[in-house]
Amino acid sequence: MKMIVTGAGRGLGREIVKEAVRRGHEVAAGLRSLDTNMDPLQELKDLASGRLTLLELDVDEEESVLKAKEAMAAKWGALDALVNNAGILLAREQSIEQLEFAAVENTFRTNLLGPMKMVKHFLPLLKNSDNPCILNVSSEAGCFSWAHGRDYPYGLSKAALNFFSAGLRKELSPQGFAVYALHPGWIRTPMGGSEAPGDPADTAQNILDLIEGKIEADAEAWMIDREGKAMPF
């Protein structure tokens, strides 16, 4: 399987890359810059027998996405799985009166427009796969049933990502695509914090199981947890 993972420099993204390589897949690890956060992945690359590509990819910048697409089109020609994992968390616990809208704009640029750019430009490669899968790493924070104040940039961006995922599923599922928004759970990452109960390595295993079909997601679900169970939106 050929797979691209955005936001692969740390946290859940790095664990997904590690697990995918361990399972023998060909993986492109999207990194905003090849000058930072590379050491653990470089060590993995040395052990991956050519199956790991470190790909300079800033999802905030459409030109960067286009360059990455051209590079992988030349290298692979097809793509089986796109994992849109890159995300940011800004201005948490700020009231609406405290909120600066630059934080909202920046969060939407990464958390929503980033995945949209990735899907738009990598779709031709995904269409060359027999079993294409798009997995958008989202959050229950974007579900109306979970909404609370003081989490506006992140929660709103994930709600929009969930809506995008639902629409994309309706558009692409007739063409044989699997499309999901996935809530990974509260896990110990730079975003989730050290107090989180979940291990990102365990979540990465579940994500690979979902992509490989070892875990069957609920048939009509587009918003799922790491076990493939439908989540209320």
Predicted regions and their residues:
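N-terminal Rossmann NAD(P)H-binding glycine-rich loop of SDR-like oxidoreductase domains
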Residues: 9, 13-18
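Conserved glycine-rich Rossmann-like NAD(P)H-binding loop of the short-chain dehydrogenase/reductase
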Residues: 23-39
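Hydrophobic positions on the long internal alpha-helix
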Residues: 83, 118-122, 126, 164-165
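Structural signature of the Rossmann-like NAD(P)-dependent dehydrogenase/reductase core
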Residues: 5-6, 84-85, 132-139, 178-183
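Catalytic loop of short-chain dehydrogenase/reductase
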Residues: 88-108, 127-174
